[in-house]
Structures are given as C-alpha cells and as structure tokens.
C-alpha cells in the first residue's frame, strides 16, 4: 500500500489563493497530519454571501465560524467563551453572535451571512451584534500563523493579505458519513468544486520570507561551565518578551546544527529542583553542544510549559495531593502544554540554521518547528535520570504526553 504524503499532491501557490480570497471565492486550507489533519473551507468575511454559507453548510458540513483578529474582537466586544481554554488545540472561541438587525431566527444562510458581514464591517460596534447567536467568532493569535499554525490564523492572514478586513469565514470539510475528510479526499473535493487549495505550512513559509516577529537586540560573550558561547538577546515584536540564544561556533546553513529549544524553568534551571528534569536537560544540552563544538540553545521564556510561574507552583501543590502533572494542569483549567515554538523557530532561522539535529524528547516540539524553513535531520534524545521526587513526573511525560524517555 502506497501512502501518499502532502508532497505527493499538487497545491496552489499562496499568491493564487490570496487572489481568489480577494475576489470573494472560497478556498481550501489544510493543516499538518500531526495536528488536526483536516481541511477547511475558507473565505474573507466581508465577501460572504448567503450562497457561500449555503455551500459551506451543504458541502463542508462542519461548524461555520468567523475568525477575527484580537483587535477586531475587542472592537466588537467579543468576550471569550470560557476563561480557561481546555480545547486540545486552544481554538479561541468567543460567545456566539447574531446581527442585532436584519435577521430572523439567525440560523438561515441569509441570516448567518448578514451576521458575518456585520462582524467584518469596520463601522460595526458591539451594539450591532446580539449574544448568543448562531455564528461562532474565533480570536486569532496576534502574529497569525507565525505564532499559531491553525486554520483560525490562516483565515485572518489570508483576508489581510488580500487587502480586506482581518476577518474570515471557515468550515471544516466532512465526509457524507460525518467523518473528517483527509488529504486524498480533499483533493477530490477540490477537483469536483473547482477550488484552490493550500497548506498552512506553505502560508507560514510565504509569510516567513516577508515578515519577521523577532528582532536581535544584542550579542555578548558568555563564558560558562560548558565553554564559551555567544549570547544573543532577541525581542518578540508581538509582546515585547525577551528570549535568548546561546550559540557556539559558526552556523553553517549547509550542515546540520545541534539544537536545543529549552523553555524556562526557574525552579529546575536555577534552584536545581528535583521535581522535574528541566535543569538536568538544560545542562545536558549545553554539555552536548560543547562536546559537538558547534550548536545552539534557544532559551524561551515559557515558564511551566507556558502556564507561568505562579500557576506552576499551584500545580505543584495539586501534585502533592496525588495528581500527576497533566491532571494538575487540567484541574487549574490549562492544557498539558501551552508552549508556542514559532518564535523559537524564527530565532533559529535568523541565526542561519536550516538543517538541525534536535536535542529533545518531545515530539510536539518537532511539529512546532515545521513550516518555518527548518529541516530536522535527526532527533537526539536527552537522557534524564529519575529520582524519587520526579519518577512519577517522568512517567507521566512518557505515558500521557508522548515524550521519548
């Protein structure tokens, strides 16, 4: 049996897709097989028609949503549906809405198109929408697909690139039997209905060569217990947060570079906490880079797998009461892992890394770096010795989070 990959199929260029978006046409956007592995019908919100909504409802069969930028959502007073988002991919739903005027029940194709046009109208205010309703707005991450490789961000990015309001419409594509359509079926769907199709990875690549969300502020010499490094200070243009890159030797674009992307862990990295293996992994990575003679360690300010220091300490207390690290996060209302690797990928690319040998036990990090012009040629495990304080933690990472320990 021959397994077809994304490279087997013919996709349209982003320029052609943007051209269709600008003309008010529907396109198909697919994501990676390691993520949702789905295709969505996508169009610009300000170009929506009742016919387009009817097409999505009849042929897409998924949930019709209206992705918008955070700025637009704030202008319209669109509050998040829940305070703590536990959805597996953290799709940022707001409270559902209908247009305040010009609709009846709110569910017809005409009514939903009217609501979406109100969302896209730059003159609309919170008074122009009624809550709850039959259209589901989604908040896109600032920075779009360069921050989060999701359909929400792709829809808003494509609308903006087409010179339109930062608002879109999307609907998942399902089979007749209600199961998700995958890439081979999406290609047949595309052919049947004459639609253009692109991948989120190609959109990331398109934006990456035209935009940059990190900027280098300073480089200093950094002597360490593991030899001399050059310390690069980067600032995120999205939130002003600073991240670091420790670089040893010369980066050669034509040779694989040994790379570690390490998320900050104050308790483990600084205080030597034995509740986790973060400090051990940090020092093991620096040691391996020193032995290699060339490599990069990117230090991301993402404490507690992204939930922050205070929440991590509260999670520790729940772990003392018998919960594991995943259960503790869930009890606090957080997913098991909130980290965002897009900025780390941009830092690596800015440093000149193209191919890399990845020091990680976490397969999700590999997925998080894909689509940014980086090619992983080898996953290099980091071995951590269990102790009585972190044995349960390491077993949870292996059994529930897929870490290769």
Predicted regions and their residues:
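Catalytic domains of riboflavin
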Residues: 1-405
């Amino acid at each position: 049996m021959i397994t077809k990959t994304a490279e087997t199929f013919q996709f349209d260029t982003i320029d052609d897709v943007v051209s269709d978006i600008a003309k008010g046409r529907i396109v198909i956007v697919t994501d990676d097989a390691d993520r949702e592995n789905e295709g969505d019908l996508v169009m610009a919100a300000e170009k929506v028609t009742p016919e387009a909504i009817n097409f999505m409802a009849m042929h897409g069969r998924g949930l019709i949503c209206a992705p918008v930028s955070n700025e637009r959502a704030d202008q319209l007073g669109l509050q998040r549906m829940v305070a703590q988002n536990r959805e597996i991919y953290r799709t940022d739903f707001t409270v559902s809405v209908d247009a305040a005027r010009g609709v009846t029940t709110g569910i017809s194709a005409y009514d939903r198109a009217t609501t979406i046009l109100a969302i896209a109208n730059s003159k609309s205010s919170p008074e122009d929408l009624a809550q709850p309703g039959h259209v589901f707005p989604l908040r896109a991450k600032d920075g779009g697909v360069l921050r989060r490789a999701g359909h929400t961000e792709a829809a808003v990015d494509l609308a903006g690139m087409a010179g339109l309001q930062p608002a879109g419409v999307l609907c998942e594509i399902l089979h007749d039997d209600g199961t998700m359509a995958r890439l081979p079926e999406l290609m047949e769907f595309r052919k049947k209905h004459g639609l253009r199709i692109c991948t989120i990875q190609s959109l990331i690549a398109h934006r990456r060569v035209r935009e940059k969300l990190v900027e280098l502020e300073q480089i200093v010499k950094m002597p360490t217990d593991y030899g001399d490094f050059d310390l690069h200070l980067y600032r995120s243009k999205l939130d002003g947060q600073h991240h670091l890159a420790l670089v040893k030797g010369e980066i050669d674009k034509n040779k694989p570079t040994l790379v570690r992307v390490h998320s900050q862990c104050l308790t483990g990295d600084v205080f030597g906490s034995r509740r986790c293996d973060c400090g051990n992994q940090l020092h093991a990575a620096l040691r391996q880079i020193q032995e290699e003679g060339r490599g990069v360690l990117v230090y991301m300010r993402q404490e507690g797998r992204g939930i922050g220091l205070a929440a991590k300490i509260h999670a520790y207390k729940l772990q003392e009461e018998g919960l594991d690290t995943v259960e503790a996060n869930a009890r606090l209302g957080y997913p098991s892992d909130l980290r965002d690797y897009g900025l780390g990928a941009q830092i690596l690319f800015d440093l000149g890394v193209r191919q890399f040998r990845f020091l990680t036990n976490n397969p999700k990090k590999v997925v998080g770096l894909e689509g940014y012009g980086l090619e992983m040629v080898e996953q290099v495990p980091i071995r951590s010795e269990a102790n009585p304080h972190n044995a349960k933690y390491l077993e949870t990472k292996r059994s529930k989070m897929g870490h290769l320990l």
